[in-house]
Amino acid sequence: MPFFTTARALRCSGGATASPHLHVATVAEATWRRALFYVVVVVVVVAAAEAVPPPSPPQSRTLERSFEMGSKEALPAKDSSIKEAISGKPVLKDAMKFFDADIFNDSKLREMEEGAEEFNVPAFRVNRKLVASVDGGLHNPSVLVFNSSWGGKEAPQDKRFDYPCLCNVKRPSNDEDIAFMTVLELGELIRTKQITSRELTDIFLKRLKRYDPVLEAVITFTEDLAYRQAKVADELLEQGKYLGPLHGIPYGLKDIIAVPHYKTTWGSKTFKDQVLDIEAWVYKRLKSAGAVLVAKLVSGSLAYDDIWFGGRTRNPWNIAEFSTGSSAGPAASTSAGLVPFAIGSETAGSITYPAARCGVTSLRPTFGTVGRSGVMSISESLDKLGPFCRSAVDCAVLIDTIRGKDPDDLSSRHVEFEDPFHVDLEKLTVGYLESAEIEVVDVLSSMGVKLVPFKLNYSVESVQSLLNITMDVDMLAHFDKWQRLGHDDEYEAQDQWPVELRRARLVPAVDYIQAQRTRGKLIREVRESFKVDAFIGNATDWELVCLGNLVGLPVVVVPTGFTTIEDPPKGGTRRRTTVTTGIYAPPDRDHIALALAMAYQSVTDHHLQRPPIDDLGPDDEIPVPPNTKP
């Protein structure tokens, strides 16, 4: 999903106790107070719908027609079924207990019902027609903008990292060794003309087609586009124009990221034939850097977990397991050497979980680092895009390429990163939680980093419930039409989004805003207790996943080893369970987490291990599609 996800942060202008991290575009305070009252009353009335007689068929058809773009039919100003209900016992009397607001007498309840029927329900319908006629949150973003910064400045646009120079990189003799090279190594082969982009594209497309039947990691092959982009990359190099380390390098995108002329399915059977005439900002950045798109990779349905309309994506290290998290395709494909890198997304765990399960290095960056226009939205205050790579060095190269201000994403900004390749480790104080992998602590300590025991202190009792309230309401706003037309009945996993989004209908606006105020309190308390430059902890601890996404903390997921699988087959197997840790930093300090991860990986080789995808054991088989050479 998310693995989980949270909704957009709100703050009323002028509120003395509101968090400084929750900003509102200029709107008069009085307008917001009045709008807030309308929203609260209407949410309550809508939640009481089951107590109201169902609308007649003509009214139902009118409501459905209201979603059609360009419809000129006037919306009904009043709903006779509501008026009919108001004439008897107050409809809200029984419903208010679901909102913990059963505090009004019958007279006040009737007054609320009449006001909602006259003012709020018509306004709701008009607003839905204006902004909710298309699902996915691609258009009409909210003007309420979450800023995760702890006071950092915006960086100059041209301030980029100083990448290490790789000398004496030689082309391996076989394609598999090439497939598991890092981005910088492949870039050096391209730059020195030891290999062409066309050749690399051939290698990775063959691997994708060979191993996808078992991993179920690809939704769409972008073969024609890939060869066109590879041809351009090779021609530019012949002309003496080198675009940088991503020049001619193949990659994959999670299939919630729009690319013109190709399907963007969001992993959902409802949208499996959808083609968007949109070019996502992150795709533009990669195209400008010379990268070659070879595939749209699996997203869990509507960016939730690893189940999608074509199956369920598997873990290359143990095909009896699944990849876990909605960026399943990017994680599995990178792990198996099917692409050198891929771009995924996280709202709550969809980068960290699949990276940890599949044993790849990944970066969930500071919120706002990478523009999200052209990307399906769950929560505008939580959604983030980040890279899956074979090393932290490659993650640094990728984030340097895709970061920056997206003019169509109000939350994106020029984050003031320092160069991770020039961080003085001996000046850092790094905390470690009880859940930290001790090998990482020992290795960094031996390299001059000061390591101290650490714990974050905050008073919020349940960060998970805070995350869920926020996420579910925001997601429902982006998929209101989808739910109203009954498409949730078609959803691939009925215990996931359908249940959560139905429950989201019962979140009052007042309590949603209280949740955002609580989020602001959490941010302040985490900032006050964050007395170190970074800390090391479990990358998949659910409390940390929820907290990190609510606050906007960056984290690098780092492979640290392997354990044996549970109940291995008697004949033996090379399947293993990956072990990882997370290196967390304050917002805008991604370079510190990257520098620490690079330091650890410079003296270890866990991240360079290859999954046993061709030698899984006597009871495992890898299907080879027809007309595809091994």
Which ranges hold each PLM region?
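Glycine-rich, small-residue loops and helix-cap segments
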Residues: 146, 159-160, 193, 248, ...
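N-terminal, positively charged, Ser/Thr/Ala/Gly-biased leader segments
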Residues: 209-270
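Short glycine/serine-rich loop/turn segments
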Residues: 243-385, 433-435, 473, 538-542, ...
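Short helix-loop capping/hinge segments that flank enzyme active sites or metal/cofactor-binding pockets
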Residues: 153-175, 246-266, 422-436, 466-523, ...
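An N-terminal boundary/leader segment
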Residues: 2-4, 8-12, 28, 33-39, ...
